[in-house]
């Protein structure tokens, strides 16, 4: 077959494959748009507008990690889906999978640091916490560790030659390197990543369980203390006149007037509500993170074990391709979680929209 006929055949095959890939391209495009806008807002608000705490810095770093996935990884994925049989670049293939490995490990490290910081603040309030200055040093250190741990991805992935179904026409695609397709290295690599994520997730569940237990104990202790205060206000002693008892209430290390008890109770409730909501936000972020990665690992391990993917004409092809890219949901979901559950983030986001629309109305 001459070159012109080969190019024409590949062009037609590409167009046929494009029709099959349209749902996957649409999914990636939506994730790219929402993830870029949402994580851009997360980075700006949590780094510039929120309190300068270690937690907010970690959230901004996680937003940068997701933003890089949206701006560097997803566009190449869309191009490879559009020209699935004619687009291949060995450099971009290595870069794509290398950046995925870095993002996976770095996201796990940042989410782990957030959980540790929340645990120290809630369960160990009188001990030394992670300061913002220390967090500024921890983020680059985690990036260096992620970079080093991701180096094996360069050898695992690479060029692979596949048959197009037309006699005499083969193409090169980005997949597991031909030298490794029958080896055990890809299986070891993905099992290591999956084991690392599950290990971090297990520690997160233990930490958030301890946090919830500390909050519950704090609430029970507060109720007992307020009950003692109320009993002292209602039951004056024989040595003390009732009028004197109405003027002040005395408990160990605390002296206050009766009308301030309700104010103290409300202040405790507000603080408890804030702590509880903050912990719920980061617990949901951790849960979405691990859930969004599980379909990707399951589909990938199935491919490695069976040493083949899913045929394009199969009914399970589109679900398989969506499962391979399931972790994109983690990059998109976090801004919506903050927007729904974080009042301060929602207010700052509304201010940004007000400024944008106000400028447009001036022109």
Regions found by a protein language model. Give the residues of each.
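Alpha-helical transmembrane segments of multi-pass membrane proteins
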Residues: 32-35, 61-74, 101, 105, ...
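Seventh transmembrane helix
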Residues: 204, 280, 286-300, 320-363
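Fourth transmembrane helix
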Residues: 103-113, 120, 127-173, 199-209, ...
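Intracellular effector-coupling site of seven-transmembrane GPCRs
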Residues: 64, 217-292, 296
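Helix-to-loop junction signature of class
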Residues: 28-32, 68-84, 97, 104-111, ...
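Extracellular TM2-ECL1-early TM3 structural module of rhodopsin-like
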Residues: 17-29, 54-116, 121-132
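Loop architecture of class A 7-transmembrane GPCRs
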Residues: 7-13, 85-97, 101, 135, ...
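Extracellular N-terminal segment of 7TM GPCRs
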Residues: 1-37
